[in-house]
Amino acid sequence: LVTLRTVQCNVASERLDAVAAQVFRLSRGGELPELLRSGKVFINGRTVFDAGHVLKSGDIVSVRGCGRFVYRGIERETKKSRFFVKTEIYC
């Protein structure tokens, strides 16, 4: 049985590095690029090396050693043009 926990994140864009860094509490400049370079980041089962990959609603993002989440899309935009995005983390 799979349990999903819904989490809202405040991000600047729908880029993979922005959302994954918020969900897994990783550094966008240090830890996440290293995971991308070493081939430990997957979207829908395919290895991704591009930090700028734009996520689409329904994408399943998996990071080895951190976990997996389903990206559900933008909930709303803030006054400062940032986005609240909805994700569901596998527990």
Q: Can you say where each PLM-predicted feature lies in the sequence?
A:
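Helix N-cap / loop-to-helix initiation motif
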Residues: 27-29
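Residue-level marker of positions within ordered structural domains that often coincide
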Residues: 25, 37
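Short hydrophobic/aromatic patches on the structural cores and recognition surfaces of FHA
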Residues: 31-32, 41
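Short, well-ordered loop/turn sites that connect or cap secondary structure elements
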Residues: 35-36, 55
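Ferredoxin-like alpha/beta domains used as RNA- or RNAP-binding modules
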Residues: 1-24, 47-50, 54-91
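Short, structured beta-strand/loop micro-motifs enriched in basic residues and often containing a Trp
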Residues: 38-46
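Generic alpha-helical secondary-structure signal
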Residues: 19, 34-35
